[in-house]
Structure formats: C-alpha cells, structure tokens
C-alpha cells in the first residue's frame, strides 16, 4: 500500500509540473506530444487501477460495531427524525434539532443565532481548537419515490437509509459522537440554510473574523479531502418581442423566443470553445439552460420569453467576464439580465492565489492524515470560507451520487471511517 500511495503522490506532482512546463490547454510546439504528457498518462493509467488493488471493504455487523459508530448511529437516528427540509425554510432556532445538539455538547460554549427565513446557526467551542468543522443540517425536500418514511432511519445490511444521512447529517452525528468520546479542543458550526442558496449563517460567521488554521466543511466526499471544486452562477434573462400573426415576414427581433434560441446557440458555441481550459483535474465550463418560458401558440409571434441558465466555472475563470460575455450574446440586448446566485470556486482568487490556497489546504490534509481526493464538479460552502480568507477543504462521509435521491443512504464503513478520523483530530495528537 505504501508503494501505491507514493505512486499516487508522484501522479499529483507530475500533474502540477505538467501545468508549469506547458500552459494548460496549449498544444506542444509543432503539434508534437509533450514528453510530460506521456509520463503523466502512464501514471494516470496506474492511478485508474488503484481501486482494484486496495483491500476489499469490510462490512460491519452488530458484533464488531465500535462504540464510536454505535454512538454515531444513535445520534444520526435522532437527527434524521427532525424535519429540516429546505424549502420551506421553516427551521426554528428553539426546539427541535438545535435544542438536541445543544444538549449533546456538554462542556462546550454554545451560541445559537436565528438569522431569519429558516437560517439558524449553532456555534460550539471547547478549549482553543485550531480547526473548525462546518456541517449543514438542512436537507432537500423528499420525493414521492421514497419507499418508507424518510424521517425514520432504517438499517439495511451495510448501510443506513434516511433523509439527510448522506447529505450530511451523518457527519453531524459523527462529530457529536467524537466530541463525547473525549475532552479535546473542538469547534463546530452547524447551519440550516445551505440548501436555500442563501448563506446567511456563513456570512454572519465570516463577519466575526474568528481565527482558525483551517475549516473542514462536511459534504459527501467518500472520506477524502477535496481541495478544489467549481463555482456556480445562476442567471435569469428576459427577452422582449412584438406580438403578431406568424404568417407574415418577421423581423429577426420580433419573436422573443427566437431571440432566446439564437442567444442559446451562441452561448453553447462559446462553452464549446472553453473545453480545454483546466484547473486541478477539472476541465471546461459546465453550462446548462435549465428553463425557457414564453409564447402563446404556434401561429402567434412570442412577445416575451424568460430563460434561466447556470454555469459552473473553474477556479481559474473570471465569473464577471463570463457574465459579460453571455450578456453580450443577446441581440438585441436582453430586456433583463440578472445573476440570481453566485457561489465562488474553491479555492477562491486568481490563478496564482487559488493555487497557493490549494497547496495550503493540501498541507492541512497531510498534517491531519486525510486522504486527498480529486477535485469535484459540485459546489460547497467551503468556497465561502476560502473567499473569506480561511484555508478550507471539503471532507465528509458518503457518496455525492446518493445525495438528493429517494432512499438516500450512507454506508456504515463510511460513517465509521469519518467518525474515527474526526475523533483522532479532536481527541488525538492534532
């Protein structure tokens, strides 16, 4: 296993050297393949095989369940029972899940703040910790496809099922269990507004400027430290046309829907042109036209249309520049162009600053003996901490593929590994 770890470390180093020797996305002179590309691809093939040479995952039964995992499951069962679906943004500061957490953290200084509209934060500190753990307690709404009550956790074989067990109440339960397994220094920030895309809890915390060496944000990363992910931007556009009968010759700008479709073609072409942009293992720009509304019937020129789109940039991309480019594709100019939500990339900053912050997060992961995973496409609030000046990484149990799904689950192995790692960080040598 040591050989495999060293090979993976060399793979990461080669990837970084590759970007230094030849600018990302640029061809080698004369079209010749860069020698570093050949070496890098060889290690990429070795890396792809590493999962097959790992020891098989051991399943956990009742006889070999650790006390820490048993405590984690007990807390998780209770946390799942609290309805923290978001929307409808109806989570209260008093009673319910926050009273439970306060009661489970004896010896901590606990502060609960209601930021309005279902945004509640619980900040708990014991001693003088170096690291802050952040977990959101809200979940997405359940769907009709659940096979049983989503707020009643149930165990099936090697996993537990329930709304939020993977995203991300399992991490909250493990942190509480670890906190009660010893008396080490610890700091937790629990929040309830992550799924609302209105991060009041994090904004209020950042305004305080409290000193921490790093922030570990819990999201489903399969127990690996994620150092980089995409940002996110959501946009609302409105197009204005002129109503009329569709039988006549039309001015190109007469139909608001035609304007929207022409805009979409230009936008998609631009996205294709960015396919070779790269940062930390991520490539290209993720882009989606999610909804188009407008028009009345087939023989009427559409007087108005509304379009919603979103994109997920690389940490190295200029979001304001992308927005200006997308707005400029509207001809005539869109009647309305509004960015409705923005989440920065992780790490934040320009290319040089982002890389500096990524390396700082890597050093934290190494110091805490956390395995380092690949960059991911999904967005997390770790980027908000990074933009606020903290070294931040994403680390939690579970697979993102299970988040937001019916019969959401997390495996016992994932919960136990995460619980053991945070217990070591809180009560061990770190």
Q: Residue ranges of each PLM-predicted region?
A:
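Acidic/histidine-rich catalytic neighborhood of metal-dependent amide-processing enzymes
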Residues: 164, 168-234, 279
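Aromatic (phenylalanine/tyrosine) cluster motif
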Residues: 11, 16, 36, 40-43, ...
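Active-site metal-coordination/substrate-binding segment of hydrolases
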Residues: 132-190
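Glycine-biased, low-complexity coil/linker segments
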Residues: 1-3, 30-32
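Metal-dependent amide/peptide-bond hydrolase catalytic core
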Residues: 67, 114-115, 141, 233-430
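Low-acidity, Ser/Thr- and Arg-rich intrinsically disordered low-complexity segments
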Residues: 2-5, 12, 47
């Amino acid at each position: 296993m040591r050989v495999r770890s060293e090979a993976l470390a060399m793979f990461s180093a080669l990837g970084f050297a590759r970007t230094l020797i030849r600018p990302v996305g640029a061809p080698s002179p004369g079209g010749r393949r860069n020698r570093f590309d050949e070496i890098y691809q060889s290690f990429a093939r070795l890396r792809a095989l590493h999962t097959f040479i790992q020891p098989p995952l051991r399943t956990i039964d009742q006889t070999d369940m650790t006390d820490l995992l048993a405590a984690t499951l007990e807390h998780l069962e209770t946390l799942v029972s609290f309805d923290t679906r978001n929307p409808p943004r109806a989570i209260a500061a008093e009673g319910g899940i926050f009273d439970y957490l306060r009661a489970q953290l004896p010896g901590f200084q606990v502060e609960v703040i209601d930021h309005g509209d279902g945004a509640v934060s619980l900040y708990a500190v014991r001693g003088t910790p170096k690291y802050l753990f952040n977990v959101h307690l809200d979940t997405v709404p359940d769907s009709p496809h659940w096979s049983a009550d989503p707020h009643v956790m149930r165990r099936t074989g090697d996993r537990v099922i329930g709304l939020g067990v993977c995203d991300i109440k399992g991490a909250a339960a493990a942190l509480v269990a670890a906190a009660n397994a010893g008396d080490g220094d610890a700091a937790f920030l629990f929040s309830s507004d992550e799924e609302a895309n209105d991060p009041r809890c994090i904004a209020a915390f950042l305004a305080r400027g409290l000193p921490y060496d790093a922030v570990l944000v819990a999201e489903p990363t399969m127990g690996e430290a994620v150092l980089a992910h995409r940002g996110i931007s959501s946009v609302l556009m409105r197009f204005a046309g002129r109503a009329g009968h569709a039988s006549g010759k039309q001015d190109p700008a007469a139909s608001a829907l035609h304007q929207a479709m022409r805009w979409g073609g230009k936008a998609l072409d631009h996205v294709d042109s960015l396919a070779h942009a790269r940062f930390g293992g991520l490539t290209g720009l993720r882009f989606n036209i999610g909804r188009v509304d407008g028009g009345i019937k087939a023989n009427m020129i559409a007087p108005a249309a509304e379009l919603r789109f979103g994109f997920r940039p690389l940490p190295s991309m200029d979001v304001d520049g992308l927005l200006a480019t997308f707005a400029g594709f509207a001809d005539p100019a869109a009647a309305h162009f509004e960015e409705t939500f923005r989440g920065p990339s992780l790490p934040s900053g320009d290319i040089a600053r982002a890389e500096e912050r990524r390396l700082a997060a890597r050093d934290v992961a190494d110091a805490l003996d956390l395995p380092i995973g690949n960059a991911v496409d999904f967005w997390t609030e770790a980027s908000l901490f990074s933009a606020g000046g903290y070294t931040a990484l994403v680390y939690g149990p579970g697979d993102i593929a299970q988040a937001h799904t019916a019969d959401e689950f997390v495996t016992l192995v994932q919960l136990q590994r995460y619980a053991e790692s945070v217990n070591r960080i809180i009560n061990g040598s770190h």
